[in-house]
Structure formats: structure tokens, C-alpha cells
A protein has these predicted regions:
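An anion/phosphate-binding loop that grips the pyrophosphate of nucleotide cofactors and donors
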Residues: 1, 46, 164
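C-terminal alpha-helical cap of glycosyltransferases
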Residues: 250-283
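An aromatic- and histidine-rich active-site surface loop
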Residues: 3-22
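Conserved donor-binding/catalytic loop of nucleotide-activated donor transferases
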Residues: 22, 162-164, 178-189, 208
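A short, well-ordered alpha-helix in the C-terminal region of glycosyltransferases
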Residues: 237-251
């Protein structure tokens, strides 16, 4: 290896230690707002340290953001709105709420929204609900009203984002970064486990006014009625929140991280004279 790039987790620590022993440049990228142990160790070994969020405490850190798929980072939501509507069988006349708990789904979101499907449709609020595989349900809705579309997963999330006016979701680092990159307002419901990193991940966009946060236990059907319904129907407020979200979003983190890797590569120490001589003698 000529550069070791680590993103944290238990496998990164031995890689960082081996790279330091072999004088191989190290690049550390911390995805979450609160740095994990492996990256706290790795950041002490290199000047090439990248964070996703402002406020993450690591030595030598530069805020680069989260590298995202180009389909998301370069998304023009307005230009692709009709395509997104068609892809999911939605009706462009209605405001659209995207509900997603990630690839595995989120039981709290699924059950709370399922119990309010008829109310949302009657209120003229269209829902695209990504439940997670095996967690689909048949929504109850009135004969006349906005569609409520349930899918187990979405392999073209950029089209779901293009169709959406508001997102209700967990606050994993990747989700927060995707939504801010494309300028979508969101209601964040942090996963209630771990060391609270999901709450910290949403802190920057919340401070900017680009989202709301509600704890998992408080996200009830009644909370949807009292908060999601009026918010989703308030186009002016959604526009302001979307602009605020976009103000903290970063669309070029992939290029910025690649540039840091190139700079790390260029910083490699010159081969030792004895190593060069030894290679020549064995040729």
C-alpha cells in the first residue's frame, strides 16, 4: 500500500499501526459527529484528518463532509421531480412526505405512520414510505385523497429525494449528509442506541434551522398529527428549512477527500539510501 485510508471501526486501528510502522501515509476520515476510538488513535499519527461535521474534535482535522454517490450529490431535485413521481407512482399535485428508516427500516416510524395513513391522505399529504424489506403493510386510506405508497426499499434514493418535500428519517451520518446536500428539510428521529452519535449528527442542521429532532419514544401517531401534518402542508416553512439545510450541505466531499489522499501520497518519505542500494544489489 502507498496510502492507508481509514474510516474508523475496530479494523482500522491495526491498519493505522501497521502503516505507521512502515512509514506509509495515513488518511483518517471520521463519518460521525462524535469520533470513535479507532479514529481518535489514528488522528494522532497523521496530519491528514478529515471530518464530516463541524465540531468533531480530532487533532489536525479539516471539515470535508461525507463522500456521497454522484447521483445524490449532483441531484437537481426540481429538474427530476416528475421523474421521481413517475418512478414511485406518485401524483405531483400533492405535497410529498418521504418516510425512511434505511435499508432495515425503523419500527417506530413504520407503526406510527401506518396508524395515520388515512389521516395523512385525507389531509392532502402524499406519502412515500420505505419500510425496509419484509416490513411492508397495506395502508388504510379514504377513497378520495392523496396516495400513500409503500415500498420495501428504494434502490434509486435520488429519485425518492427528487419527489419529496419533507423527509422523516433516522439521523445516521450518511442520511443527514445526503439530505443537506440536496436541500431537503427533515424530521430526524435518532436511533435510541449507542453513544448518542445520531443525535450529534443532526446538531449542525438543526442549529441552521434545516430540520426538527424528536426522540424515538416521543415519535407517536399523535406527534405526527400535531407536528408532521401542519409542517408538511406549509410550503413557505418547508422552503425556508430546505434552504437552511442546503446551507450546511456539502456536495464535493468526494473530490475533497480524494485531494487529501493525493496530498498524503505526495508526502511519502523518500526511500532510504540503504533500501535503494539493497534493491540495486539484488537486481
Amino acid at each position: 500500500a502507498e496510502v492507508v485510508v481509514g474510516f474508523g471501526g475496530y479494523v482500522s486501528t491495526p491498519a493505522y499501526l501497521a502503516a505507521r510502522q512502515r512509514r506509509i501515509p495515513i488518511v483518517v476520515h471520521e463519518q460521525n459527529a462524535r469520533a470513535g476510538l479507532a479514529n481518535r488513535v489514528g488522528a494522532r499519527m497523521t496530519p491528514f484528518v478529515a471530518t464530516t461535521f463541524r465540531g468533531t474534535v480530532l487533532p489536525h482535522a479539516s471539515v470535508l463532509g461525507m463522500p456521497l454517490r454522484r447521483e445524490v450529490s449532483q441531484l437537481d431535485r426540481a429538474a427530476r421531480r416528475d421523474e421521481g413521481m413517475t418512478a414511485f407512482g406518485l401524483d405531483p399535485q400533492w405535497p410529498t412526505i418521504l418516510v425512511t428508516g434505511g435499508s432495515l427500516g425503523a419500527q417506530r416510524l413504520n407503526t406510527s405512520f401506518a396508524s395515520r395513513a388515512a389521516e395523512l391522505s385525507a389531509a392532502g399529504l402524499q406519502v412515500l414510505h420505505v419500510t425496509g424489506a419484509g416490513k411492508e403493510f397495506e395502508p388504510e386510506r379514504p377513497d378520495i385523497g392523496a396516495p400513500y405508497v409503500v415500498v420495501p426499499y428504494a434502490d434509486r434514493m435520488e429519485l425518492a429525494y427528487a419527489a419529496a418535500d419533507l423527509v422523516v428519517c433516522r439521523s445516521g451520518a450518511n442520511t443527514v449528509c445526503e439530505l443537506t446536500a440536496v436541500g431537503l428539510p427533515a424530521v430526524y428521529v435518532p436511533l435510541p442506541i449507542g453513544n448518542g452519535e445520531q443525535r450529534f449528527n443532526a446538531a449542525v442542521v438543526l442549529a441552521a434551522g434545516g430540520g426538527l429532532l424528536v426522540e424515538d419514544a416521543a415519535f407517536t401517531p399523535e406527534w405526527i398529527t400535531d407536528n408532521v401534518v401542519p409542517l408538511a402542508g406549509d410550503g413557505e416553512r418547508l422552503f425556508a428549512m430546505g434552504s437552511a439545510a442546503a446551507s450546511v450541505g456539502q456536495r464535493d466531499a468526494d473530490d475533497a477527500l480524494a485531494d487529501m489522499v493525493h496530498r498524503a501520497y505526495a508526502s511519502r518519505p523518500a526511500p532510504r539510501a540503504d533500501a535503494v542500494g539493497g534493491q540495486g544489489g539484488s537486481a
